[in-house]
Swiss-Prot record:
Residues 67-84, 413-426 have a biased composition (Low complexity). The lineage of its organism: Eukaryota, Fungi, Dikarya, Ascomycota, Pezizomycotina. InterPro entries: Mmm1, MMM1_dom, SMP_LBD. This is Maintenance of mitochondrial morphology protein 1. The gene is mmm1. The chain crosses the membrane at residues 24-44. It holds the Pfam family MMM1. The SMP-LTD domain is a barrel-like domain that can bind various types of glycerophospholipids in its interior and mediate their transfer between two adjacent bilayers. It comes from Talaromyces marneffei (strain ATCC 18224 / CBS 334.59 / QM 7333). Residues 92-103 have a biased composition (Polar residues). It is a single-pass type I membrane protein. Residues 140-389 form the SMP-LTD domain. Keywords: Endoplasmic reticulum, Lipid transport, Lipid-binding, Membrane, Transmembrane, Transmembrane helix, Transport. The keyword Transmembrane applies.
Length: 486
């Protein structure tokens, strides 16, 4: 009875949540959205920026931050530039074409941050003498192997040039050195004419190493001045100079006695720390922009001197000097730290008959004089300032390496001939013999006259071909001498 009641009870039908049509439309819509997202983000999306060299080895703190994407820096840049960023639709005025340089462009910390160089903060300490103390950098010192190779090539070229010009009457190193040491304004009267007997420019090269960049105090630059320190060592070389002269005794009468002297000075070893820095030169005020002195602020004598200078032409004239005025140039300043080492070997020979050889006192005097000369020029706090040349590319300084121009032209001609696949046309720089022999496709025999009839500059169209006339003898390449074309 219970089983019969179970079969007789009507089952409750399950209602589906979505119909078949609604599910089909939802599936199609999801597929369309997926395809649209794929096309938008994978096909029309912007390619990622290529990573810069050495980016993988940099730490997270080394990542470059662009000020255009930062709100604070963008506001500061807008304030320094004097307004909102310039758009392409705006037409800049003729006086404001070049955008202003940010004030932090030459800041030391900004340069170190953008070049990923770890240097200590600009904390300066002074010694008792008032000089700043060298602040060592926390960056790892760098080797200068590539710099040593360039310096060695330069020195080797100078040595070779000096040897090739040893017999030149104007550019000889012997004549230049003799004229320098025999300068009558510097040579004492008790020293006779100095004759150079031997010069050795050496065979070895200086080795630079352990380069590091530090920050030194400079009131003329923002945040201090960057300075590169590198160790230099030159040893086991034969740099030497030998001279002969005479000491003259001019009392009681001129040339009362003459004492021959021969000296030879050799550099045994030199080592020290070289300091290199770039110093921007001060902008020279152009004469046109120089203010005219006011007569009320000057007395009569000063005003008269100024007017006389202008009338006499001593004042600067912008048209008289072809060089550009008011353009600052960067200077290279280099010097050595006081802890340098310069070992010399001095040999002397005094007298004519009874000669004194290698007198210690003479060696001490010569070494002291050389050390004094060196310290007065390139030892801190004295520096040597050299103006850097103009490195802007110019047409007048453009050159082609020898032997590569002709090879490049021949390669271009051969490539164009092979790409056409037919009879190549001759160029004025390629001889006709090379064109005929190197032709990749030979549709038929090409006839040419005897050698010397046509110059190498004639083109392919000017070569003789088989004409309609039958009486003209034709030469076939490879035929016997005197043979006739049948």
């Amino acid at each position: 009875m219970s089983q019969h009641s179970q079969y007789d009870a009507p089952g409750v039908p399950v209602q589906p949540s979505l119909s078949f049509t609604q599910g089909f439309l939802l599936g199609q819509l999801s597929v369309v959205l997926l395809i649209g997202a794929f096309i938008k983000f994978f096909i029309f999306g912007e390619a990622p920026a290529p990573p810069s060299r050495g980016l993988a080895s940099r730490t997270a703190s080394h990542h470059r931050s662009y000020s255009i994407n930062q709100g604070d820096n963008n506001v500061s840049n807008n304030n320094t530039s004097g307004g909102s960023p310039r758009t392409l639709c705006e037409k800049p005025s003729t006086s404001n074409v070049l955008r202003p340089v940010p004030s932090s462009a030459t800041n030391t910390r900004s340069i170190l941050r953008k070049t990923y160089y770890n240097a200590i903060p600009t904390q300066f300490s002074h010694t008792k003498q008032g000089r700043h103390r060298i602040q060592h950098s926390t960056h790892q010192p760098e080797s200068l192997d590539w710099f040593n190779v360039l310096i060695a090539q330069t020195i080797a070229q100078y040595r070779q040039t000096a040897y090739l010009l040893k017999d030149s009457p104007t550019s000889s190193i012997l004549d230049s050195l003799s004229a320098a040491i025999n300068d009558p304004q510097k040579k004492p009267s008790f020293i006779d004419t100095i004759k150079v007997t031997d010069i050795s420019l050496g065979e070895e090269f200086p080795i630079f190493s352990n380069c590091r960049v530090i920050v030194v105090d400079d009131p003329n630059s923002d945040g201090g001045r960057l300075q590169a320190l590198m160790d230099v060592d030159l040893s086991d070389d034969n740099l030497s100079l030998a001279i002969e002269t005479s000491l003259i005794l001019n009392y009681p009468k001129p040339r009362s006695a003459v004492l021959p002297v021969a000296l030879s000075v050799s550099v045994v070893r030199f080592s020290g720390t070289l300091c290199i820095s770039l110093i921007p030169a001060a902008t020279e005020q152009s004469p046109s922009s120089a203010p005219t002195p006011d007569a009320s602020n000057l007395n009569v004598r000063t005003l008269f001197q100024h007017i006389s200078a202008e009338l006499n032409g001593t004042a600067a004239n912008p048209t008289a000097n072809p060089e550009k005025k008011g353009v600052p140039k960067t200077n290279l300043a280099f010097s050595f730290l006081p802890d340098y080492r310069l070992d010399l070997s001095v040999r002397s020979l005094i007298g004519s008959r009874s000669r004194l050889q290698d007198v210690p006192k003479v060696a001490q005097l010569v070494e002291a004089r050389i050390h004094s000369w060196f310290e007065e020029r390139v030892v801190e706090p004295r520096v040597q300032v050299v103006g850097l040349p103009d490195f802007w590319p110019r047409k007048g300084r453009t050159g082609v390496r020898p032997g590569e121009d002709a090879e490049a032209a021949a390669a271009v001609a051969a490539a164009s001939a092979s790409s056409r696949g037919g009879a190549p046309e001759a160029t004025p720089s390629v001889p006709e013999e090379a064109i005929i022999d190197d032709s990749p496709v030979r549709p038929g025999l090409r006839f040419r006259g005897p050698a010397g009839r046509y110059d190498s500059g004639s083109s392919f169209d000017e070569l003789p071909r088989a004409g309609p006339g039958l009486g003209e003898p034709l030469d076939i390449p490879g035929s016997m001498p005197g043979g006739r074309a049948q």
